[in-house]
Amino acid sequence: MKPDAHHVKQFLLRLQDDICQKLSAVDGANFVEDSWRREAGGGGRSRVLRNGGIFEQAGVNFSHVHGDAMPASATAHRPELAGRSFEAMGVSLVVHPHNPYIPTSHANVRFFIAEKPGADPVWWFGGGFDLTPYYGFEEDAVHWHRTARDLCQPFGDDVYPRYKKWCDDYFFLKHRNEQRGIGGLFFDDLNTPDFDHCFDFMQAVGNGYTRAYLPIVERRKAMVWGERERNFQLYRRGRYVEFNLVWDRGTLFGLQTGGRTESILMSMPPLVRWEYDWQPEAGSPEAALSEFIQVRDWI
């Protein structure tokens, strides 16, 4: 089947609505919407929930941008895209809770198509979701990965292990030699066996995010925390910032294509701290995190 960008866009708009509604229902606060236009073509709608009952900041962004030429970040490793017009659309979200016992979560699903007259379109899907805990709970990690495995299962036995490994490899801070979190799923350049199959998988990932995350929020939201836990959360959020600004391809693509900076950087935590050469106390729950986020098979 020929790629149908319109159908993808309609799904993404519904997905943004659905995720925002479910996060609001858990939190009690509402999202504020900010619609924007891109001068070079396209636009989007950014939604942010701030200082809610549970979430310090949750950002759920839809964007649909298009242009006559590809940015350098895309053509560097895809020379066949040179000279093509393009459309890129997606939903991207990051949730930063108040409570340090609730992990930060990130999800993204996207579609890209590049065309030129007289040639077949070049298209693919990408996306995934990943979890960044501050305090490790095995049952949360197992639930997160089991949900990921179950949504992958109808698409083949090899899908979950392949995209889990890709996620572990991608969300890695090379300059720190450590994982960002416990991973989940990451896929990109998905265009086989056909459009319908790939679109179905992208929808499964997008719809699976709240099933993976919200039970963890419910399980941890009543846990009591204090200044110690908060300081550790802010310190670890620094790793999140480092990854997004140094390593994340999506951030680079957005900035190079003249995307909306406020929306691109919506993933940043509202508060964060760095402390020179800080080390957690031996044997403490904070010290246990470095072992907890090591790559492993959770299920």
From Swiss-Prot:
What's in the keyword line of the UniProt record?
A: Cytoplasm, Heme biosynthesis, Metal-binding, Oxidoreductase, Porphyrin biosynthesis
Q: Which reaction does it catalyse?
A: coproporphyrinogen III + O2 + 2 H(+) = protoporphyrinogen IX + 2 CO2 + 2 H2O
Residue span of region Important for dimerization = 240-275
Pathway annotation: Porphyrin-containing compound metabolism; protoporphyrin-IX biosynthesis; protoporphyrinogen-IX from coproporphyrinogen-III (O2 route): step 1/1
Where this protein primarily resides, as one coarse class?
cytoplasm
Which terms does the record give in the GO molecular function aspect? coproporphyrinogen oxidase activity; metal ion binding; protein homodimerization activity
Q: What class of enzyme is it?
A: oxidoreductase
Family membership, please give it: Belongs to the aerobic coproporphyrinogen-III oxidase family.
Assembly and oligomerization: Homodimer.
List the PANTHER family: COPROPORPHYRINOGEN III OXIDASE, MITOCHONDRIAL, OXYGEN-DEPENDENT COPROPORPHYRINOGEN-III OXIDASE, MITOCHONDRIAL
The protein's job, in short, is: Involved in the heme biosynthesis. Catalyzes the aerobic oxidative decarboxylation of propionate groups of rings A and B of coproporphyrinogen-III to yield the vinyl groups in protoporphyrinogen-IX.
> What name does this protein carry?
Oxygen-dependent coproporphyrinogen-III oxidase
| Species per Swiss-Prot/TrEMBL record | Salmonella paratyphi C (strain RKS4594)
What does the organism's lineage look like at the top? Answer: Bacteria, Pseudomonadati, Pseudomonadota, Gammaproteobacteria, Enterobacterales
